[in-house]
């Protein structure tokens, strides 16, 4: 079962008919979001989905920013941590994957990668800090990693950080 229709949901399409797993890919995706209604909607959907499918393993995608002191007080990051805690209470069979900056064709226009691509295509001026960096994770790599974890079936009720082995300077991303 796949809940959602965005970049992650599309990548996990092969799980649509899976009767044992919920890929929850329908959450707040804009890391600059501050609207409480969006946060409540996600929590309510997780609650309803989990209650309607109590025997299925819940796969939830959170953010590595929870461990980043420079941003972990932002509403989005606080919300993701709150959802992680909520899942631990309402589900007895879950894995939470904390992701770095996800990239892939299509997806959220608010991600750093998609912002840079659209700005370049539209010939817009972009201010870039030469020492700023981002850890980019391709959605295909996310899918392959999660699929392997699920195939091994050795992890339950845990939080797993998924990120690239290195971060990239923003100028590197733009030039490449």
Regions found by a protein language model. Give the residues of each.
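N-terminal Rossmann NAD(P)H-binding glycine-rich loop of SDR-like oxidoreductase domains
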Residues: 1-17
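Catalytic phosphate/metal-binding cores of nucleic-acid and nucleotide-processing enzymes, i.e., regions
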Residues: 13-15, 19, 94, 138
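NAD(P)H-binding glycine-rich loop region in Rossmannoid oxidoreductase-like domains
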Residues: 14-55, 63-71
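Non-catalytic, hydrophobic alpha-helical segments
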Residues: 22, 142, 146, 162, ...
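Active-site beta-alpha turn of Rossmann-fold NAD(P)-dependent dehydrogenases/reductases
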Residues: 26, 59-63, 98-100, 163
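Catalytic helix-loop patch of NAD(P)-dependent Rossmann-fold dehydrogenases
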Residues: 39-48, 64-104, 108
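NAD(P)-dependent short-chain dehydrogenase/reductase
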Residues: 85, 89-134, 139-143, 147
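Mid/C-terminal beta-alpha module of Rossmann-like enzyme folds, strongest
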Residues: 152-176
